[in-house]
Structure formats: C-alpha cells, structure tokens
C-alpha cells in the first residue's frame, strides 16, 4: 500500500497502531498514542481529526441522518465511501461493546456491524479525550422517534413492538442478556407492511451459554417499563396517534414475547400415530424464521405419548412480525 498519496495525517498517527481484535494485550492499559483496534485495517481512519471532541469535528465530515436518543455524543461520519456511526464512551466500555457485537454478529444475530475502537485520543494540549466505538451505519434504518415524526399508520407502535419481540426472543435464545431493552436501543428496517428490529446498543449486555428464566423476565419487565415511558414521551410531544394506549402497547410486548417463546421452546405431546404433527411444528418454526437443528424425542412412561422438543437455530434472514404468530 502506498502512503505517499494519503491525506494529511494527525501528527499522533505516526505513533499509532492498528491491531487485531484478538490482541490479548489490547485492553490491558490506556494507550499513550492513538490506537485503532479493528478486525481489518482502513488507512482512511487515520485521517480523521481524532484530536478533537466528536462534537467539534468539521461539519463536512458529518452525514445528516436521524439519530436516536443517547446519553453519549453520537455522530454519523463519512469515512471514504462508507458511513460510520461514532460514539464517544470510555475505552473499557467501547472495547467490551465492540467485542460483544463481534460475537453477536458471528452468531448471525440482527445487530449493527462493529468496525473499530479508537483509543489513546488526546487534544492539542495533550489532554485525554474519550475513546470511540465505531459501527457501520445500517442503511435505510430509522430510530423509532424518526418513524413517528412521519405520517404513519395508527398501528405503527404495535408493528414496532412485534419486531422488538422477535429480536428479544432471538437474542435470548442465543444466551444474550440485554440489560437495557428499549426502543431507543434498536434500529428498525421496513419489511413491506412490517418492520425488522436490529440491536444497536449492547453497552449493558452480556453473552451466556443460556439464560435463566429470571434473566429473561427481567429483560421483559424492563422492556415493558421503558417502552411505556418512551411512548408517553412521544405522546407529550404530540407524535403519537391519540388512539394509541401506551400501557396496552407495553403489555403487548410481554404477550408477544411469551407467545413466540412458547412456540419455539414448548414440548409437544401426541400419540405415535400423530407423527405428522412433527412436520407441522417444523414448518411453523420455519415460517417464523427459525430452523430446526435437531429434535429431542422421548416416549412417556406408559409408551402412549411421544414428547418432542425442537432445538432451533436462527436463519440469517429476519422473520417478519407479520408472519403467522405475529400477524
């Protein structure tokens, strides 16, 4: 690669490094020089004004896209031909969220794509600046507030909740404990008359082999509380149709989640001459966007009943909330 024709670099980039995310020492201590941790190198990243707080970057770098509510400074930035979302947070949180998003992507779960962690940032006076988590902008996606700012059908809130229920079940089946479920931490893509939901903020999350019922129920209860609050906020800003009942929408998430979870995990019981019901159950799961990895089959003690529990894996394409159960 020829660097002679590269744009002017930040002076600190001379000492900077771009390392693999698998570097065991990557998070051991605060870097003294600019350090970009990424799965693959992108020299254009070094040309950005890392010596400035994100809010003070030149306006011509920014892309005017709808942003959700965040407790951090977040901007969309042109990096070559790509558009990246930049979020200023502490180095430890940035590195943890980056690795977690990478693991979720490897599981083919619907999340934004992590690009890099940028640490070792200092201003012109040598004062430390917060690190940045860089993710790829999800094309055509919108945060929930941007959707409600448009003229939409009165049942938009219900369709968003249905999409969020599917996302939560997918994440929970893979052992992901969210810890901060809300509409603000999700991006939505239109899917004909429905929506697909994507995880955008994994700051408080954690990945386990499996989740306990208590962990799942905590996520569900928190989601209900947050959603009701977010919808009430929209209502106070006159962005929510008057016929929408915020509490009913929050309760809808709980009902949809439990219905889908039951469909995916319950044990079927039937007599040996009703084996056709296995195929119907498998087809039903396929329609919802889940593939059956294997079937666990047992007979009852008296031998009169067959017990079947499917073990599912996730198809890459997101199931539409309008399909079957969530119609």
Where are these regions (language model features)?
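Active-site activation/catalytic loop segments of kinase-like enzymes and analogous catalytic loops
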Residues: 184, 216-243
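ATP-binding glycine-rich loop module of kinase domains
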Residues: 73-98
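Catalytic activation segment of kinase domains across protein kinase-like and atypical kinase folds
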Residues: 184-222
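Single conserved hydrophobic/aromatic residue that forms the stacking wall/gate
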Residues: 316-326
């Amino acid at each position: 690669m020829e660097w002679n024709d590269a744009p002017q670099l930040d002076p600190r980039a001379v000492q900077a490094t771009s390392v693999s995310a698998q570097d065991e020492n990557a998070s051991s201590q605060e870097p003294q020089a600019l350090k970009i941790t990424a799965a693959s190198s992108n020299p254009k990243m070094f040309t950005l004004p890392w010596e400035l707080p994100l809010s003070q970057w030149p306006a011509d770098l920014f892309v005017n896209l709808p942003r959700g509510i965040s407790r951090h400074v977040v901007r969309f930035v042109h990096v070559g031909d790509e558009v990246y979302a930049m979020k200023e947070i502490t180095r430890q949180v940035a590195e943890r969220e980056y690795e977690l998003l990478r693991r979720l992507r490897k599981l083919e779960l619907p999340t934004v794509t992590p690009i890099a962690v940028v640490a070792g940032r200092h201003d012109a006076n040598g004062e430390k600046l917060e690190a940045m988590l860089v993710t790829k902008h999800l094309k055509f996606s919108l945060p929930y507030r941007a959707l409600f700012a448009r003229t939409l059908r009165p049942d938009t809130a219900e369709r968003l909740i249905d999409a969020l229920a599917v996302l939560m079940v997918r994440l929970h089946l893979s052992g992901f404990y969210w810890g901060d479920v809300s509409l603000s931490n999700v991006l939505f893509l239109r899917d004909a008359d429905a929506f697909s939901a994507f995880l955008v903020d994994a700051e408080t999350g954690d990945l386990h082999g499996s989740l306990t019922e208590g962990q799942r129920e905590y996520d569900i209860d928190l989601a209900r509380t947050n959603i009701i609050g977010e919808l009430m906020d929209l209502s106070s800003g006159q962005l929510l149709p008057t016929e929408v009942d915020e509490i009913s929408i929050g309760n809808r998430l709980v009902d949809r989640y439990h219905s889908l979870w039951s469909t995916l995990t319950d044990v079927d019981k039937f007599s040996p001459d009703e084996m056709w019901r296995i195929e119907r159950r498998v087809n039903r799961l396929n329609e919802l966007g889940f593939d059956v990895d294997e079937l666990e089959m047992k007979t009852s003690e008296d031998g009169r009943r067959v017990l079947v529990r499917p073990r599912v894996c996730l198809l890459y394409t997101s199931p539409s909330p309008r399909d079957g159960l969530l119609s």
